[in-house]
């Protein structure tokens, strides 16, 4: 079976949904050699992973994941990474900002792969630990407003492919599947993607899987997996079994355009310091504005605001008053 799939991929043909599922099941059953897996991942990358293949991978990986049983549906804010942009951890800042506004957040993340600091590295640098207990994380979401989901604890099948992926040293279909695998009960998701082409494929894969209320985006002018304030952002919004495509520029909501370099980050400690300053409302305006605009789109996806501009103004005011930092200190147990 695996050899048949390899032959098909080597001829530049796409796998169908069931064939893609079968590859992941073979990884789980350990019926595929490292050489075969490496060849399949590279072959898919060279011909270009199509929506059915992505959907097949996601379907099994999510099926096999340990689930987080939060009672109140939550939102996830994450990105594919792989944009080589060295921005600070914007989606992590957005996650805590949303939680401080009373929005339930299930932050699904990992350590750094290609960047200097992954979301989990920064969350730990902020003083928070990651639990491997699904019930504990669900309780954090329901009671505290945010739960941190460290991906490797919850996706055993992904773990079986880590060695091959590391040796390949390139982005593979797993990089697209990863952000689509949040094991919590979700009400919506905003998901940054490193390429516009891949964004379209991921949106179409989610449609195949009958997912709903996911906003995919890509910073078109600067190539980042965030909603950009230094250029145009393109979107694919999956809602009610339909994908809508649209664009956004900072000027649309009266925000000035910044330089791409204004959002540069560093290692986990440096990025944690940037986030602390944002939470206190004492950061550079560029940092506060990009967190506010990404948060505003999340509020829009959840139906909490009618217009992104309304959300932006509300979030920026909230940040400037130090409300996010007050919430962070409560999570740390430093205030009543």
From Swiss-Prot:
Enzyme class: transferase
InterPro entries xref list: Anthranilate_Pribosyl_Tfrase, Glycosyl_Trfase_fam3, Glycosyl_Trfase_fam3_N_dom, Glycosyl_Trfase_fam3_N_dom_sf, Nuc_phospho_transferase
Gene field: trpD
Identification of the protein by name: Anthranilate phosphoribosyltransferase
Positions of 5-phospho-alpha-D-ribose 1-diphosphate binding: 79, 82-83, 87, 89-92, 107-115, 119
Species, as recorded: Dictyoglomus turgidum (strain DSM 6724 / Z-1310)
Positions bound to Mg(2+) 2: 225-226
The record's free-text note on cofactor binding: Binds 2 magnesium ions per monomer.
Keyword Signal: no
Annotated anthranilate 1 binding sites: 79, 110
Record: residues binding Mg(2+) 1: 91, 226
